[in-house]
């Protein structure tokens, strides 16, 4: 069901300062940027991203890539998982928030709409 860890999301109060830290100090590469609210950074040789967001998060968030959010939800509910947030549209597909039987919260998402499109400066374009 899980294909991979798509991303780990961290809250940062200032995206530009966080990008200086993670890019210049830690050497992560910018994959995409959505204005002053979000940016995705490549983690090493993997295609898992560290996503920095200015929106408040209760805790760091782990997002798992699945083939289909709806199919994954059906399976998760059958085996004791809980639906916390109904599926909703995101730029690349669908997303939902779920919880395992031990109250570990995580996100599942699919790429039913494809990858983000970016310009030469890695800014997300529509």
Spans of model-derived segments:
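Residue-level "edge-of-site" marker
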Residues: 35-36, 89, 116
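Conserved short beta-strand elements that form part of the metal-binding/catalytic scaffold
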Residues: 29-60, 105-111
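N-terminal first-folded block
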Residues: 7-11, 17-42
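N-terminal beta-strand motif that seeds the catalytic metal site of vicinal oxygen chelate
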Residues: 1-19, 47, 60-62, 112-126
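Vicinal oxygen chelate
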Residues: 63-105
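Short alpha-helical
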Residues: 16-17, 57, 70-71
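Short glycine-enriched loop/turn motifs at secondary-structure junctions
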Residues: 2-4, 54-59, 89-90
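Residue-level detector of conserved, well-ordered beta-strand and adjacent loop positions
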Residues: 9, 42, 53, 84, ...
